[in-house]
């Protein structure tokens, strides 16, 4: 069931699918805000964290839900200078995580199982990512899962670079009597990297296929060169897993990335973030994708409760 409601002084949309409720602000960042699930005993479990107070005038700074990262994920650099990217035309500004998460969208379609929204780049975004394109966010909601597809449609005459991603703020720990150290993430065989202060990728050779969320070493670590396009996490012991999988419309990509990040030791969330590639993709060309004129590319992510 799809309804519109007032929430935190904003008019938002809500989808109910079986035991799941999805709270969304399609016009502001195409932002999935919350995902709740009603348990068998009538209690409600928060899957995606959303703060009790949110300043929508600073949407890019709200720590919750799933910010859309476009055209590039995380920090961009130009010859070591933060906040710029290596465009085909040379040095241009690029904020952390791009423009979409704080940008305006137009709701193109709302159906019983989800919606499609189109990015409306402002003057700054048009100047600094100067291409002719349509960027769509398509969410499909299910009883115990969601699928989100990012599509870049090139309507111009030159190829367009991109390396988009997601910033899921998962509620963790989600049991009142457990701590972070009781949860673990299972990764496919992969390599770990960190980004230095000039935008270079430095290999972290401590990465393991099973990592504990209580281990500070996984915070702000980029996992890439993944042997499979999937991962899962949950309480040690194998119950109540959250599973993620991803794919490109244009085939497997060696530099797909999964980043793990949180803010503080006592933050109510831990972010598990599927990206099309590592940060600073435009300069390193690792995980950089190109869309030819009059074609489109899509990146689909599925999150499922196990």
Protein language model regions, located:
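Extended, loop-rich substrate-binding clefts of extracytoplasmic carbohydrate-active enzymes
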Residues: 1-7, 88-143
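Beta-strand-rich N-terminal accessory domains
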Residues: 1-69, 74-75, 81-84, 226-251, ...
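Acidic, contiguous internal or C-terminal segments within carbohydrate-active enzymes
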Residues: 15, 26, 39, 121-168, ...
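A short, structured loop/turn motif at beta-sheet edges
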Residues: 39-42, 108-115, 140-145, 174-179, ...
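Acidic/His-leaning functional-site neighborhoods
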Residues: 94-109, 212-286
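Beta-strand-rich interaction surfaces with strong enrichment in secreted/lumenal proteins
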Residues: 136-138, 286-291
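C-terminal or internal capping secondary-structure element at the end of a domain, subdomain, or sheet
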Residues: 145, 156, 289, 295-306
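Active-site/ligand-binding surface loops and adjacent short beta/alpha elements
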Residues: 159-161, 169-249
């Amino acid at each position: 069931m799809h309804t519109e409601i007032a929430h935190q002084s904003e008019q938002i949309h809500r989808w109910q699918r079986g035991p799941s409720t999805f709270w969304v602000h399609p016009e502001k960042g195409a932002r999935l805000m919350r995902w709740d699930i009603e348990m068998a005993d009538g209690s409600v479990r928060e899957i995606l964290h959303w703060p009790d107070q949110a300043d929508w005038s600073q949407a890019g700074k709200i720590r919750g839900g799933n910010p859309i990262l476009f055209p590039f994920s995380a920090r961009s650099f130009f010859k070591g200078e933060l906040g710029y990217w290596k465009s085909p035309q040379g040095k241009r500004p690029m904020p952390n995580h791009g423009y979409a998460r704080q940008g305006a969208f137009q709701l193109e379609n709302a159906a019983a199982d989800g919606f499609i929204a189109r990015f409306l780049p402002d003057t700054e975004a048009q100047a600094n990512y100067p291409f002719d394109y349509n960027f769509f966010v398509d969410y499909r909601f299910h009883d115990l899962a969601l699928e989100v597809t990012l599509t870049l449609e090139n309507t111009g005459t030159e190829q367009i670079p991109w390396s988009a991603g997601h910033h899921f703020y998962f509620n963790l720990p989600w049991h009142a009597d457990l701590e972070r150290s009781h949860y673990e993430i299972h990764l496919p065989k992969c390599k770990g990297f960190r980004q230095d202060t000039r935008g270079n990728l430095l290999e972290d050779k401590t990465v393991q296929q099973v990592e504990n969320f209580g281990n500070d070493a996984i915070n702000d670590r980029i996992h890439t060169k993944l042997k499979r396009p999937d991962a899962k996490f949950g309480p040690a012991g194998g119950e109540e897993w959250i599973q993620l999988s991803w794919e490109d419309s244009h085939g497997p990509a060696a530099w797909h990335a999964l980043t793990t990040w949180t803010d503080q030791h006592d933050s109510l969330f831990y972010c598990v973030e599927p990206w099309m590639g590592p940060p600073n993709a435009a300069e390193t060309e690792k995980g950089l994708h190109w869309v030819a004129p009059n074609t489109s590319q899509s990146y689909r992510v599925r999150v499922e409760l196990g």
